[in-house]
Amino acid sequence: SLDPKIASTLEPRAPTPERRLTAVRRLADAGIPVNVSIAPVIPAITDHEIERLVARAAEAGAQRVFFLPVRLPWEVAPLFRAWLDAHFPDRAGKVMATIQSLRGGRDNDAGFFTRMQGQGPWADLIRTRIAIACRKHDINRERVPLRRDLFRPPRGPQGELF
């Protein structure tokens, strides 16, 4: 979210939206290809910002944008419902109904091809909005080729974690 209040409610200790966009700009200015993840897209809470998020990511120098609709695996679902009731009680029912519509009527869909993108009309709408916004801002045109020539093998044996 670009809204500092929503962003801090979702991720209280994470960098602000502006700091994240500054990081995108600095990486892009240094010649590093940058992808931006718009996640989680939460119906009736963050989905209204999609076009603006794509525009700001493009302005900051991102080459690609992708999205992930909110996922509620296992223990996350009751935590999310409690968070929703605490912060957005006026929309909790609508949010959960929409999430379930893109997850086959359930809070979660662990299917390999559907868990990260969702399915159904709402997921299709978000995909279409992302695609239109990306065309408008001239991003997601092509993938950056992998530069294996930039890889430097370590000088010695790999270190140990423990």
Residue ranges and their predicted role:
Residues S1-V24, P33-S37, R64-L68:
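Core AdoMet radical
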Residues A30:
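Conserved dinucleotide-binding and phosphotransfer motif residues
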Residues A7-T9, A39, G111-M116:
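Glycine- and acidic
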Residues H48-F162:
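Auxiliary Fe-S-binding modules of radical SAM enzymes
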